[in-house]
């Protein structure tokens, strides 16, 4: 019995330690730009294909074109400014489609994607989703929306070995992220579901069609969406 009690005591201490460590890490990352993150580490260890070079340069949100900010919101999470980390309607739709044997994209919010890229591995287990939800909740409570968007745009993968808006802008268009046009921004956002498959330059027919849809959504959302993001706490 003593052995069992010791095991449970050790496990309780471990869980408590991880609990406080997770909170501390999110607090620190509100002010410190992460030098590395789990998705990049996993790609380095288990790349889908050989990577010759890894590109990444951190940029503040003010140094990233508003066109790209809006394009990513239009493509990935149009309710970003208003939700608390989770899009319940999208989750409900995903469950319904999965029950029918279909797949639906878009159940994960930008907050969830940022949490996954920062802290998680690529497994689809319920344990991973639960931990991802915990980090998403922490980020929504401790960060503001602008910080979540900034981190997402700096760590998301835009192509093999290409991380963040600045590296993607320079690689595909030969310019800084601050100078991206609406068309260029929509191309980058169109590739986000699978940047290893969907090519930005030259864009595939799918990317062209999706980028046109994204630009239409951007017109409907308008600049007021970014204003709401910057005002949201």
From Swiss-Prot:
InterPro entries: Glyco_trans_51, Lysozyme-like_dom_sf, PBP_transglycosylase, Pep_trsgly
Annotated metabolic or biological route of this protein: Cell wall biogenesis; peptidoglycan biosynthesis
UniProt KW keywords: Cell inner membrane, Cell membrane, Cell shape, Cell wall biogenesis/degradation, Glycosyltransferase, Membrane, Peptidoglycan synthesis, Transferase, Transmembrane, Transmembrane helix
Transmembrane region(s): 7-27
Pfam families the record matches: Transgly
A cellular-component GO term for this protein: plasma membrane
SUPFAM superfamilies reported for this sequence: Lysozyme-like (SSF53955)
Any one GO molecular function term: pentosyltransferase activity
Membrane topology: Single-pass membrane protein
EC numbers for this chain: 2.4.99.28
GO biological process, one term: regulation of cell shape
Catalytic activity: [GlcNAc-(1->4)-Mur2Ac(oyl-L-Ala-gamma-D-Glu-L-Lys-D-Ala-D-Ala)](n)-di-trans,octa-cis-undecaprenyl diphosphate + beta-D-GlcNAc-(1->4)-Mur2Ac(oyl-L-Ala-gamma-D-Glu-L-Lys-D-Ala-D-Ala)-di-trans,octa-cis-undecaprenyl diphosphate = [GlcNAc-(1->4)-Mur2Ac(oyl-L-Ala-gamma-D-Glu-L-Lys-D-Ala-D-Ala)](n+1)-di-trans,octa-cis-undecaprenyl diphosphate + di-trans,octa-cis-undecaprenyl diphosphate + H(+)
Protein location: Cell inner membrane
Domain of life: Bacteria
Family according to the record: Belongs to the glycosyltransferase 51 family.
Function according to Swiss-Prot or TrEMBL: Peptidoglycan polymerase that catalyzes glycan chain elongation from lipid-linked precursors.
NCBIfam families tied to this protein: mono_pep_trsgly (TIGR02070)
Protein's name in the database: Biosynthetic peptidoglycan transglycosylase
Taxonomic lineage of the native organism: Bacteria, Pseudomonadati, Pseudomonadota, Gammaproteobacteria, Alteromonadales
